[in-house]
Amino acid sequence: MQGKNLTRRTVLTMASGAAVAGILSPARAQQVPWSTGAEPAKTKAPPNATDCHHHIYSSRFPVDPKAVLRPGDALVADYRLLQKRIGTTRNVVVQPSTYGINNTGLIEALTEFGSAARGVAVVQPTVSDEELKALHAAGVRGIRFNILTPGGATSVEMVEPLAKRIAGMGWHLQFHVGPDFILANKDLLNNVPCPVVFDHMAHIPASSGTRHPAFTAVVDLLQKGKGWVKLSGAYMESKVGSPTYSDISGIAQAYVEAAPEQLVWGSDWPHPTEKSDNKPDDAVLFDLLAQWVPDQAIRNRILVDNPARLYDFS
């Protein structure tokens, strides 16, 4: 009888210990599609933390014939797993070049996400006022010019006419461009009647860093309150790579020092520029922000307050 009691007691103790361990130890997040690793981020996200740059892909929507990037499905349900892993609760869905000016998938994703999401669309000057109003009602607050990716549906000639169309709506212009574009179009960027937002730290090369004249041009826009930068895509220009991306840190930290009130953060999930067997670890990318911005109050500003202002979150 005593042997049986000991066995039962041992089993109960083991079960209890396992339950306590499950409560006290960090939960292992479910594997997120298009992301390396499964551990949660070490940095605690504040309430209403916002991922200001990600995409949604679905094979249900027609691909633009000129599109170069054609990832597999990366759905709303998949992205929610990423939110659970890193702790963000608000998000900005960016129309990818894959679908050109067909924003149907973007609108569907915004509807599924609900009021905690905003969007950035891709349009051309022929877009009607009714279409712009419908996009606004769906949660869109900006339009994107992807000049860097071949086969994009937009061009520099479209910037001025579209800027005039959206300025009164409280929208912004989002630019996926390189340093050469920034330097060649400084007057345009300064004079358009709405804010300008640069994807992925404006693609400043790690080799030149803050010495690059395009960095100076971007900082000038930030300090005027005209420009914004997304602290995202560290892997795009880094030669050092994961987990430190140390050759990019100086650029990110210099942006923070220059104008923390004009910065937002983004994951760039599902990382369409990266091969499927070389996706970054999204928890590592989120934790980078704490290294770049050790001051929690400033970090919260970048994750919560700045996005609320730029994307009209109430």
Model-derived segments and their meaning:
Residues Q2-I23, Q31-N48, V76-R90, P260-Q262, ...:
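Mid-to-C-terminal alpha-helical segments outside catalytic/metal-binding sites
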Residues Q31-V32, T98-F181, D187-N190, K230-S242:
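Active-site gating/metal-coordination segments in enzymes
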Residues P46-N48, G87-N91, F113-R118, G139-R141, ...:
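Short, well-ordered coil/turn segments that N-cap beta-strands
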Residues T50-H54, V92-V94, G119-A121, I143-F145, ...:
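Hydrophobic faces of well-ordered beta-strands that scaffold small-molecule active sites
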Residues H53, L106, I166, V229, ...:
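Conserved, mostly hydrophobic/aromatic
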Residues P65-F113:
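Alpha-helical scaffold segments that flank or form the walls of functional sites
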Residues L75-Y79, N102, V127-E130, I182-L183, ...:
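Alpha-helical scaffolding within the catalytic cores
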Residues V156-W265:
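Catalytic pocket-lining loop regions of alpha/beta-barrel enzymes
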